[in-house]
UniProtKB/Swiss-Prot annotation:
It is an enzyme of class 6 (ligase). PROSITE patterns: ATP_GRASP. ATP binds at residues 161-224. Catalyzes the addition of D-aspartate onto the lysine residue in the peptidoglycan precursor UDP-MurNAc-pentapeptide. The ligation occurs between the beta-carboxylate of D-Asp and the epsilon-amino group of L-Lys. Is highly specific for D-aspartate, as L-aspartate, D-glutamate, D-alanine, D-iso-asparagine and D-malate are not substrates. This is D-aspartate ligase. GO terms for molecular function: ATP binding; D-aspartate ligase activity; metal ion binding. Mg(2+) 2 binds at E304, N306. Gene3D superfamilies: ATP-grasp fold, B domain (3.30.470.20). GO terms for biological process: cell wall organization; peptidoglycan biosynthetic process; regulation of cell shape. It comes from the Bacteria. Keywords: ATP-binding, Cell shape, Cell wall biogenesis/degradation, Ligase, Magnesium, Metal-binding, Nucleotide-binding, Peptidoglycan synthesis. InterPro entries: ATP-grasp.
């Protein structure tokens, strides 16, 4: 039974309509029995036909001025009851940035567990993020920053400071969302100089203005990746950290880097390194780090920080660390910090998170000890998904989610290849 502090009336408001939104809505439903309200510019499949999240579609809501005008109107029309608390949670990069930009105005009506925009800008842009990594002695891959003015007739004339293959990705992921060109991917692994010149030229021809990041490709397949989700409270104390070991990624061009199978993991060095960093920069809210093990020097190299919970972060809730509970206890119930809770892989409660059908995992994940352990977890029924939720079942929803999962079969057949380096 809830104690008196948890009887306080609050309403979770989610921004977006993707799997991240559904994972947060499910976390709130599991923890508090809440039905969430979401606002988005489009209705995406993971939240369709749901009984635990109501999505209101507002065209243009993912950009200003529609975003801030709508939020201030909603605040006055629907969220003005002083006896209630309204918790605002972004479930995508663009929405996280919009909340941070308008934090002062929005905080008059909503609880906004986000950092100020000055810090947000430093961390979200990969150029300044790698400068921050230098400052705080965090390992990251060898990097070359490319600016448009460095190109001559659409080509970068200088030699790269490392061998091919290389990784190429935008420094400004929010700006890149609206840039379209032939062969567009979220990020690229390029094998030759010719391929590199072609793609780089197309990106800037398409109107992208910010820097591009060229990096030494760290050898190894998806099983060398790690993902870390953290929650940091209003006083900059890290309340929760949960490390995941991705065993497979989505190979679809628009979704490269999205994890589709994650096993819980534990690494004391990673936990303490990231915890110290978050506290030093006075972070607050959810954070999500992508990193990869480099067998050449034994270090985990940071790729980026997402200033929100990760798209696949329901793996944290699935493993007993309910994401909604951490932010609610901090910001709504004002429960004091006691100690950092760390995710582990040792418990018999450890669960494998799956975003694709089992047959995809069994066919495409690399054969190794981790896969054997994951197969054992599946045999013991110690696995789960974000979108198949027993308290949110209907024929329409079940069929749509089955169709969504089935779609991965032709996608993997068409796009999958092993990343060896």
């Amino acid at each position: 039974m809830m104690n008196s502090i948890e009887n306080e009336e609050f309403i979770p408001i989610l921004l977006g309509s993707d799997m991240n939104v559904y994972g947060m809505a499910r976390s709130f439903n599991e923890a508090y029995g809440k039905i969430c309200q979401a606002y988005a510019s489009d209705q995406l499949a993971p939240t369709r036909y749901s009984k635990i999240v109501n999505v209101e579609v507002i065209p243009g809501f993912d950009k200003d001025p529609v975003f801030i005008e709508t939020m201030l109107r909603l605040a006055k029309e629907r969220y003005s009851d002083k006896s209630k608390k309204y918790l605002l949670i972004a479930c995508g990069d663009g929405y996280a940035e919009l909340i941070s930009q308008h934090k002062q105005e929005l905080s008059e009506y909503f609880i906004c567990p986000y950092i100020d925009y000055s810090l947000f800008e430093r961390l979200i842009n990969k150029v300044s993020f790698y400068e921050v990594c230098e400052e705080y002695d965090l390992p990251y891959p060898k990097t070359l920053i490319v600016r448009e003015e460095m190109l001559v007739n659409g080509h970068l004339e200088q030699e790269l400071p490392f061998e091919f293959p290389v990784a190429l990705k935008p420094a400004n992921s929010v700006e890149y969302l609206s840039v379209q060109f032939e062969g567009r991917k979220k990020a690229f692994i390029l094998e030759t100089r010719e391929e590199f010149d072609l793609i780089l030229g197309r990106i800037y021809e398409a109107g992208y203005k910010s820097e591009m990041i060229v990096q030494d490709f760290i050898p190894g397949d998806d099983s060398n990746m790690r993902v870390l989700n953290a929650y940091v409270d209003e006083d900059h104390q890290v309340r929760m950290m949960c490390l995941g070991h991705p065993l497979l990624e989505d190979p679809t061009p628009a979704s490269i880097g999205n994890y589709v199978v994650i096993m819980p993991d534990y690494n004391e060095k990673i936990y303490q390194t990231i915890k110290a960093f978050l506290e030093k920069i006075e972070y607050t809210g959810f954070a999500n780090f992508d990193m990869k093990y480099d067998p050449r020097d034994g270090e985990y190299k940071l790729f980026e920080i997402n200033l929100r919970q990760g798209r696949s972060s329901f793996f944290v809730t699935l493993n007993g660390l309910n994401l909604a509970r951490f932010v609610t206890e901090d910001r709504v119930f004002n429960k004091p910090f006691v100690e950092t809770t760390y995710g582990t892989n040792q418990s018999d409660k450890a669960r494998l998170w799956m975003g694709v059908p089992k047959k995809i995992f069994l066919e495409y994940a690399r054969e190794n000890e981790d896969k054997k352990l994951a197969e054992q977890m599946i045999k013991e029924n110690r696995y789960g998904t974000t979108v198949f939720y027993e308290k949110d079942r209907s024929i329409k929803r079940w069929l749509l989610m089955k169709y969504m999962f089935h779609n991965y079969i032709p996608r993997f057949k068409k796009y999958f290849h092993v990343k060896e380096g």
